[in-house]
Amino acid sequence: MTNPEQLKRILSHEVLLKIEMSKNGIVEYANPAFFELIGYEGDLFQCSFYEYLQSDDEHLMKKATDNLFRKSISVAHVFAFLRCNPIRSPNYYIQQAKAPFEGKTYIRMLFRGILVDSLYGKDTRVLWAGKYLYPQRSVINEMDFILFNTLGIGAFILHDHLLGIIKYNYIHVPPPSGKLCSLCEDNLPEWYFEVHSDFCLVWNDLVRRVFAVQQLINCKKLEIEDIVNKLPTGSNHMVEETFLSLPVITVFNGKKNRKQRFRIRSWRSSLNFLVKELDKSIKNFAYLEHRTFLTISNSAAKDMKREIYEKSLVNWEYDFLVPSKIQDYFYDVHSLLLKNLSSKIKLCNHILMYQATFNEVKNFLQTYSLNMLSIEMENIEGSLYFGNAQLSNLICVNQYLSEQRPVFFNRLLALGNVENNNSIYDDIQKRTERISTIKRHKKYFEIGERLTEKDLIVSKTFKTTRIDYFKAVKGSIEDLDVRPLKNRQKFVNKFYASIVHFLTESMQFPSHNDRRFGDNTPHSLDEFILLKEINRGAYGRVYLAKKRSSGKYFALKMIPKSSLDSLKKIKGLLLEKRNMHIQRYGPNTVKLYYAFDSGDYLCLVMDYFNGGDCETLIQKLGPLPEQWVCQYAAELLNAIELLHQDGIIHHDIKPANMLVDETGHIRLTDFGLSENVEEKKEVYKLTKRMSFEQKHGNLYEQLQPKKFEFVRYVRNYRGNIDELEKAESPQQNSDYANDSVQHLLDFDINNMDETAIHMLMNQLEKKENRTFIKKDISGTPNYMAPEILMGVDTQMGDIWAMGCVIFEMLTGTRPFEANTVKAIWARIERNDIGWTKRVKESCSKEAVDLITKLMDPDCNKRLGSNGYQEIKKHPFFRTIKWDNLNSGPGPFVPQTENVEDLTYFEKNISGSDNINKNNCQTSATLILNGIFAFHPPPKATPADSGTETSNSAAFSASEEETTNLTDQKRKDLFSLITKAFKGIDLKALNYNNKATLLRMYDEVDFPKNQQRNKEKFRIQKRPNKKYRYHLF
């Protein structure tokens, strides 16, 4: 049986896989989670889904797919082992297959599949939703296996709630409490929260893709309109415009099954035709915003999909007899319209899967709850249900029907879950017989009521004959008018109307229109209530803010646009947003949720923790106990490891950037100086390796037109960017080889926001020296590694800073203290760590050894250069359990009056001997100081030896090589920054949903039942009959 800790770790990493495949198993579409799991970088290649399954499971998947295409079933369930990349998956949900070969690893999953239409509606595909399934997972004996693995942790909550309904009068049992989904901000019942959050994540991702395509359509329309306005009024001035260079358009009429061909008479008319098609798509998108929602209604989902087909179907094709200058525009527009339709269809298919899952859960829930009632009915006192005639009679009669009770419930309720059951109900009606003689069964009915022949029904289904005994109680069955039943489920709903109503209403099932289509990204500060100022820096302030729609608290960072007066500052801000977005969120990093432009400010919405930071903790408490420091250092190392695995170097690790959350654990923040070096190196290699013509040809072969679409859009802004580059680099030729936006072809672009970020980052780089060794150095002087001062940028600089942080937390002072920045750097170069006799005696030998090895001046010999495991195995961390690092409360749990209490952020500089007011880490370098840059100092001179306040902001301003922007240049640049900056981070919001699941887990009492055998749940298929669960 799975222990609770293992289940807890599983919940925190579980994701929903979505795969669309053709009948022969070719993957036509899959969400990024699938490609990440199998270890493929990207999502554009077509592969065989069967190749990633274990050989034994391949046959089951093909059989289920064939049944779906033959429409013998509507929903299929398959347990299968999916091959995965062990590097991308945590060890605790990877297991070797039964017969491993070539070192491949597999994950056991439950796949749920339905049949969906393809792009043109001609062919059909199977949409599979995959969810991790773990062996030896705790199972509730009375609950259906599929229902359990669908609800996840909610199964335990539902089980406990139904037990309360049975034990007490259901009228007096409150409905399940609700939890707020961070993605959609809807309140969902706890038992359904995991199902909803999985589907909600995919739904939001698909919505973002629809928005991204629509943005490209808007840009393309503006571009073509601009070209039309620049065309001369007559065709005499255009020598290239010939009869053969005009497009031939083929229009298909689906209703009459005809097609019409015609040639457009001029280039102007041709471009106007494209503008008209784009305008039609824009109007349809406006309709979609008011129509599409995540629905549980099957009819609503199908109607929605049909309307999208009718309004967005691309019913025309084009052809050119000779190459033409406008040929690319036709290719771009036609590709965009197809992509627009494809993204909407994927969204509708996902809604159909959500609807199928919802109905499946609902049917299983009714069966499970009623079976559960039948099991527990013998121990219920009838007096608890006084006033409810149906339940009272049922409880009374149940004592006399104990022998036939399983037959009654199992036979009756099984029919409610048969898909497409109209034919079966007709068969039941034909096979139902009346029995005139009931004396032989009189021994089962002791109450003395007069029975009629309609009290007994012989049901002959699935070639079996069973006698279901119904007790006729006055005021219940006879009043319900039980005739030869045309629909058994109708009888169930009538006989247990109050229970069914309770399950569907009081259990707070989601409504039909709980999720409207739209972008949830905030658009202005009006969506937040600014409560208190948390901190301020050189270029902005951080406020405690409350979101009006959800009531959640966030830290809102506001950066005035007027403060971004140089390219370096703009680059630092975009890097902060970019690196917070691409990191894999762990329990020890601050998450970024939203970024938006609000008039005069650029805003970042992040995690809020009111426990203060470690710098304030050291100020108020002095040197921290070694047990505290050991836990804090381990959590800091965990955060650094995750960042480095994503190629992110933090550059500014210090106690002021280590926040304390409400449970006492560390959260690393402030990514203003961070940089993704690995990504830049890869981009540089791609740019140098391939010429523009090679890239152009390869991309056409790979059918990736979306990159060209955005490149042409970006070229509209090229003039503005080139003006900015003139201040930094010599004039370049304007040929294709030096095209300032050609590098965009090197990227895998999923939406325009990501593309704009790449483009801006590249434009803000120095053009005259294309190297990735930084000329300047970033960070806070006291925590800089020696190689950073030499201009060498490595990940080991963060490890050095970690050693400095451990030293400061243990001693209350920094390892390199001085009155000036230059003096600090001189001590760093000499490796003059502040090891006084008193300091060494106050630390353990293990702590001294760890700090010394972490601060080795040679980065190649520094502890951790051979992997982070050698740091974790150091004796200083011997008491740390790395698998359960963040379980339980931390060393110091903040005690605040309420969420808005900011007591722990109050500095106490005057009352502490450990913090020098004139030291190099002043308030100017705290949380908002994300764009300072420091350069190696020149050799000391007598004039430099005097006292100096050494404010890092003043030092940076005097030495920084900045390019000040004029008002016009800033205006032009901000037009691109707005597109690159705003966005919503689904990964961070989903992480919050997982945290909610973990808190729900902590409140669950896990049953100690024996694990049910998988084979026990295989329903034997009866020849030529539809069976209940379709489980393979």
Swiss-Prot record:
PANTHER family assigned: SERINE/THREONINE-PROTEIN KINASE, SERINE_THREONINE-PROTEIN KINASE CEK1-RELATED
* UniProt EC number: 2.7.11.1
All copies of the Protein kinase domain together span 528-877
In terms of SMART domains, this protein maps to: S_TKc (SM00220)
Q: Does the keyword Chaperone apply?
A: no
**Family statement drawn from the similarity comment of this UniProt entry:** Belongs to the protein kinase superfamily. Ser/Thr protein kinase family.
Keyword annotations of the record:
ATP-binding, Cytoplasm, Kinase, Meiosis, Nucleotide-binding, Serine/threonine-protein kinase, Transferase
Where is the sequence biased in composition, kind Low complexity?
947-957
- Asked if Methyltransferase is a keyword of the record, the answer is no
Matches recorded under Pfam families: Pkinase
> Its function?
Has a role in meiosis.
Signal peptide start-end: none
- GO CC annotations, alphabetized: cytoplasm; cytosol; nucleus
- Active site location: D652
The protein's location, in the record's own words, is: Cytoplasm
Q: Where is this region: Disordered?
A: 938-963
Which enzyme class, named as a word?
transferase
Q: Where is the PAS domain?
A: 3-72
The residues that hold ATP are I534, N535, R536, G537, A538, Y539, G540, R541, V542, K557
* PROSITE patterns (alphabetical): PROTEIN_KINASE_DOM, PROTEIN_KINASE_ST
Stored Gene3D superfamilies:
Phosphorylase Kinase, domain 1, Transferase(Phosphotransferase) domain 1
What this protein is called in its record is Serine/threonine-protein kinase ppk31
